[in-house]
Amino acid sequence: MSDFLKSIIKSSGNEYAGIASEGIDGSDVTGFIDTGSYAFNALLSGSLYGGIPNNKIMALAGESATGKTYFALGMCKKFLDDNPDGVILYFDTEQAITSDMVRERGMDPSRVAIFPVATVETFRHQAISIVDKYIETKDSKPVFVVLDSLGMLSTEKEMNDTAEGKSTRDMTRAQVIKATFRVLTLKLGKAGIP
């Protein structure tokens, strides 16, 4: 049966397809990133020593100024502590992260790359380019990606409308965000990047 399924998978041309008994590449959880909080670890993974899956996208949601950025930085610190050769790719939409903040939280700033982004399209292009390169690279180092914050990302249409003095609402924003994460979710999972 296995050879039959393998031939079907091969003929599909789907690089992400696989047989469930052999593990589903990008879907099966292979480990966890400790959040630094036993209670939050238990909520997310069912174990005090778990945390966020190391190959899944996770969103921190909450009102403005409730500490989401600081919590994300705490997870970055824990990730770097647990992965001595790991790096952080931090997409910052608010120009909020500084090298001092990184240092003050005990992280080596030479292991944290900050990517200022203003639009969903810019984030999508840069993130997909990085993930594609990561997948191609043999012996890649562990990577943790943070987008802070999704809510602050504009679209190119919104930026253009604002520049032209239009006050119309961009009705395409939700679709652009959804399309971005449809592509990124599969690619990040395949690459094993949280």
Where are these regions (language model features)?
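The Walker A/P-loop phosphate-binding site
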Residues: S2-V112, F123-D132
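Flexible beta-alpha connector loops of hexameric P-loop NTPases
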Residues: R111-E121, M159-V176
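Loop/turn-to-beta-strand initiation segments
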Residues: D85-V87, D139-F144, K190-P194
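Conserved ATPase-coupling elements of RecA-like P-loop NTPase cores
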Residues: S154-T162, L188
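Substrate-engagement module of ASCE P-loop NTPases
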Residues: D81, S167-P194
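Walker B catalytic acidic pair
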Residues: S149
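Short amphipathic alpha-helices and their capping/turn segments at secondary-structure boundaries
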Residues: A127-V145, L184-L186
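Catalytic P-loop NTPase motifs of RecA-like helicase/translocase cores
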Residues: I97, L153-S154
